[in-house]
């Protein structure tokens, strides 16, 4: 293992010490909680930082596994418009990732969902036995 790989592995282990990243694939519906920091200037000129968490729920249409630069693309329909957002898997901005539903798809990248709407954009649900889900949570 060279120096760069070792550095990336150490960095990943530091970033995942507090949070658990579940196994998910393209087609799964995930809920990503993101930390948002707002900066505002008060009347007396002081800068005020406020933190809040925002949930983003949608279907994973692509996943990119590249060690520390791994990312995934989530698509949701908001007010009739398709919205896509890419999240860096090991980013400190990503607070948590929860799998809501597991989907059955035959592709690794689901970019064809961009051209579909309504019933044709649905994804079948994959049922996982209870024993596996309990073992994964423990």
Curated annotation (Swiss-Prot):
This is Large ribosomal subunit protein bL19. It comes from the Bacteria. Belongs to the bacterial ribosomal protein bL19 family. Keywords: Ribonucleoprotein, Ribosomal protein. Gene3D superfamilies: 2.30.30.790. It comes from Rickettsia peacockii (strain Rustic). The keyword Ribonucleoprotein applies. The gene is rplS. This protein is located at the 30S-50S ribosomal subunit interface and may play a role in the structure and function of the aminoacyl-tRNA binding site.
């Amino acid at each position: 293992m060279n120096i760069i790989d070792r550095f990336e592995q150490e960095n990943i282990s530091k970033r995942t010490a507090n949070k658990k990243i579940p196994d998910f694939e393209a087609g799964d519906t995930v809920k990503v909680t993101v930390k948002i920091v707002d900066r505002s200037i008060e009347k007396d000129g002081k800068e005020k930082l406020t933190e809040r968490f925002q949930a983003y729920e949608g279907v994973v249409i692509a996943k990119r596994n590249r060690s520390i630069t791994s990312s995934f693309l989530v698509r949701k329909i908001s007010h009739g418009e398709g919205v896509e957002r890419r999240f860096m898997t090991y980013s400190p901005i990503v607070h948590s990732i929860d799998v809501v539903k597991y989907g059955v798809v035959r592709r690794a990248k689901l970019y064809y969902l961009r051209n579909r709407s309504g019933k044709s954009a649905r994804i079948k649900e994959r049922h996982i036995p209870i024993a596996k889900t309990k073992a994964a949570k423990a």
